[in-house]
């Protein structure tokens, strides 16, 4: 038996306000506000949608009413901003609305004909309601909270409103200054309310990430700019690059344009899950037609040098993806100071006769400063024609690459770090970079500098100062501490994370400093408590011990001891 209550639908809620187009004529339709929250934007799921206006964000703003107090507020959720009475609303903040307030979704101060969504607040009243999703300007209607009655629209300043012309078309569409705008049919109120709640509940971070800042829509055939790597639609950036050679986001000079295949794949996968956010066929065809980025713009360009007879050095040679055997572009020819061509390229006079006992020594090598231990095997060497070279990681100067030869002949000076395998020239012929302490040396002979103890204990300045004071009171230096630590390492008392490192291991400065810090921590850990001040030993241990990330702060470092192991949340 069917209940009499079933089948009856509850009456729609009474409207609490209405939106009027700015400059609306008498009898012109308006939008009634019935729901507690009303969303406006370009997304088709919004209560008031502008799908063809690219200057309006997908979720531009939200108008809500407090059912208890009757207060109406507007929250801006756009990327370009919402203007109320010519005052911009701060993003993610709410602004109270009053009767007669003027709302602009798109406001251009010097171009009033391009303003969109401008309107004023007006109380609700009788008259036809409009379900159009495309309006140029609108007004909202609010109830009078004092008298519970309603008054008519009273704009504050008609001269400042600058209304936009609107033409009503016979098929129900709206034509704004010649722009074709398509109206959408009114959807079921319950369906719209569910869509709005879902959209308002949690913002779509993926959509925000995949949105082009120029068109405020999902990226289409996107390209990335180098070196800043900001990404835009190819069609959107085509229009921008005709006016400027700078990046639209950071204003960095654009050196190269490249396809971003990863983002294009992400957009394609996102649209499979959200087909309602796909662009229309007309929009896609329009963007493809506006794409002015050709394939040759995506190719790397190499500057080609010409002589004065051949032409200007400003000419650029474009390289294809496939290298040609007949191409005259080759790798730059590296010449070091042991190459036979070194003097000819340096445009210096012929070398003076070498001193006796040193045949074939280039004068530049003799004059160059050196802190190397021995140059015997270096001075006798001359690079073969177009021989292999290595660039010193410290001074960036080329040297003969003899690392393979050293495996057969131990007399050849080491040229690389045993840990990071980076090339260094200090032991080969002496690094000439200003401020170099000796970028490559055996660990026991490595010069780490006088400031190597600053923050040596896990960047904890307080604990490092305790160690420095301990060494100073006993007349010890960091070299003495390193020597004692290497002896303990050899005996197995101290351990390093890289078990291959010993006192004789060839290390660069960075790898040597890292191993030195590991030994220093163990040296400090083995200092008897009786030899340290009471203020140091009386501190409680930190739960996180040596792994504490707060120990870099002076107050925390003074309060707790961090020369200990982690005791809390340790796996």
Swiss-Prot record:
GO BP terms, alphabetized: cell division; mitotic G2/M transition checkpoint; protein ubiquitination; ubiquitin-dependent protein catabolic process
Zn-finger segments (RING-type): 212-251
GO cellular component: nucleus; PML body
Keyword Acetylation set for record: no
PROSITE patterns the record matches: FHA_DOMAIN, ZF_RING_1, ZF_RING_2
Its EC number(s): 2.3.2.27
Cited CDD domains: FHA_CHFR, RING-HC_CHFR
Location of region: Disordered: 1-21, 113-138, 297-325
Modification after translation (UniProt): Poly-ADP-ribosylated. In addition to binding non covalently poly(ADP-ribose) via its PBZ-type zinc finger, the protein is also covalently poly-ADP-ribosylated by PARP1.
Annotated ranges, domain FHA: 38-89
Class of the enzyme per the UniProt entry, highest EC level: transferase
Phosphoserine PTM positions: 152
Entry similarity comment: Belongs to the CHFR family.
UniProt-recorded name of the protein: E3 ubiquitin-protein ligase CHFR
Annotated source species: Pongo abelii (Sumatran orangutan)
């Amino acid at each position: 038996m069917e209940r009499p209550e079933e089948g009856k639908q509850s009456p729609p809620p009474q409207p609490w306000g209405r939106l009027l187009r700015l400059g609306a004529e008498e009898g012109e339709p308006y939008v009634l506000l019935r729901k507690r929250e009303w969303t406006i934007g370009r997304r088709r799921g919004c209560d008031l949608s502008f799908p063809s206006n690219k200057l309006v964000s997908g979720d531009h703003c939200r108008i809500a009413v407090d059912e208890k107090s009757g207060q109406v507020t507007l929250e801006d959720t756009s990327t370009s901003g919402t203007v109320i009475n010519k005052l911009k609303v701060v993003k993610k903040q709410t602004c109270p609305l009053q009767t007669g307030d003027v709302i602009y979704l798109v406001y251009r101060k010097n171009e009033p004909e391009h303003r969109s969504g401008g309107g004023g607040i007006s109380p609700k009243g009788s008259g036809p309601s409009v379900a159009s999703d495309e309006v140029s300007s609108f007004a909202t209607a609010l109830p009078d909270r004092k008298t519970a009655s309603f008054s008519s629209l009273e704009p504050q300043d008609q001269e400042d409103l600058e209304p936009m012309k609107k033409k009503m078309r016979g098929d129900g569409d709206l034509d704004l200054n010649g722009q074709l705008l398509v109206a959408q049919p009114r959807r079921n109120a319950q369906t719209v309310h569910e869509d709005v709640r879902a959209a308002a509940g949690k913002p779509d971070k993926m959509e925000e990430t995949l949105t082009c800042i120029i068109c405020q829509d999902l990226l289409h055939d996107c390209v990335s700019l180098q070196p800043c790597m900001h990404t835009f639609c190819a069609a959107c950036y085509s229009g921008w690059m005709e006016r400027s050679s700078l990046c639209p986001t950071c204003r960095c000079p654009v050196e190269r344009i490249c396809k971003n295949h990863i983002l294009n794949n992400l957009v394609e996968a996102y649209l499979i899950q959200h087909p309602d956010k796909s662009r229309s066929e007309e929009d896609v065809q329009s963007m493809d037609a506006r794409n002015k980025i050709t394939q040759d713009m995506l190719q790397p360009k190499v500057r080609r040098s010409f002589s004065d007879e051949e032409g200007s050095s400003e000419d650029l040679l474009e390289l294809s993806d496939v290298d040609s055997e007949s191409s005259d572009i080759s790798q730059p020819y590296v010449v070091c100071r042991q190459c036979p061509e070194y003097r000819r390229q340096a445009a210096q006079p012929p070398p003076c006769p070498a001193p006796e006992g040193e045949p074939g020594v280039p004068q530049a090598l003799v004059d160059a400063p050196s802190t190397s231990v021995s140059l015997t095997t270096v001075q006798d060497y001359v690079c073969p024609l177009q021989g292999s070279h290595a660039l010193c990681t410290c001074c960036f100067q080329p040297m003969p690459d003899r690392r393979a030869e050293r495996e057969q002949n131990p007399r050849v000076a080491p040229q690389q770090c045993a840990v990071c395998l980076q090339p260094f020239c200090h032991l080969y012929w002496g690094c000439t970079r200003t401020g170099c302490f000796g970028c490559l040396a055996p660990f026991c002979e490595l010069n780490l500098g006088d400031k190597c103890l600053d923050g040596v204990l896990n960047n904890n300045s307080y604990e490092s100062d305790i160690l420095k004071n301990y060494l100073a009171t006993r007349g010890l230096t960091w070299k003495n501490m390193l020597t004692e630590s290497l002896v303990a390492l050899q005996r197995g008392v101290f351990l390093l994370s890289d078990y291959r490192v010993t006192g004789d291991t060839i290390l660069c400065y960075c790898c040597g400093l890292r191993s030195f810090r590991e030994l220093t921590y163990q040296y400090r850990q083995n200092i008897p408590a009786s030899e340290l001040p009471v203020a140091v030993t009386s501190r409680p241990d930190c739960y996180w011990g040596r792994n504490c990330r707060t120990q870099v702060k002076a107050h925390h470092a003074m309060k707790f001891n961090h020369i200990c192991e982690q005791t809390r949340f340790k796996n």
